[in-house]
Amino acid sequence: MNGTIYQRIEDNAHFRELVEKRQRFATILSIIMLAVYIGFILLIAFAPGWLGTPLNPNTSVTRGIPIGVGVIVISFVLTGIYIWRANGEFDRLNNEVLHEVQAS
C-alpha cells in the first residue's frame, strides 16, 4: 500500500515541479551566500589593513565590523526569502500533490 502511494507521489508532475523548483532556488541562494562569505574571507586574507581602517578618525569602529554584520544580515535576509517562498509557492505545490495523490 505505502509503496504505491510513494510511487504515485514520485510520478506526480506537481511533485517533480516542486522538487525541481525547490532545488534550483536553494542552489541559487546557497551560491549567493557562498559568494558573500568567500568574498569576506578573501578580504580578511588579502586586505586586512583596509578592513582594519577606522570608518572615521574619531572612532575605533573599523570597516570590517559593518561588513561582517552585513554578511550576517544577508544570511538572515536570504533565509527569510526562502521561508517566504516555501510558505507560498512550495506549500501550494505540496498541497496540490497531496490532493491529487489522495484523490487517485
Curated annotation (Swiss-Prot):
InterPro entries: DUF485 (IPR007436), Inner_membrane_assoc (IPR052959). Residues 48-61 are periplasmic. It comes from Escherichia coli (strain K12). It holds the Pfam family DUF485. Keywords: Cell inner membrane, Cell membrane, Membrane, Transmembrane, Transmembrane helix. It is found in: Cell inner membrane. This is Inner membrane protein YjcH. It comes from the Bacteria. It is a multi-pass membrane protein. One of its GO terms (cellular component) is plasma membrane. The chain crosses the membrane at residues 25-47, 62-84. Residues 1-24, 85-104 are cytoplasmic.
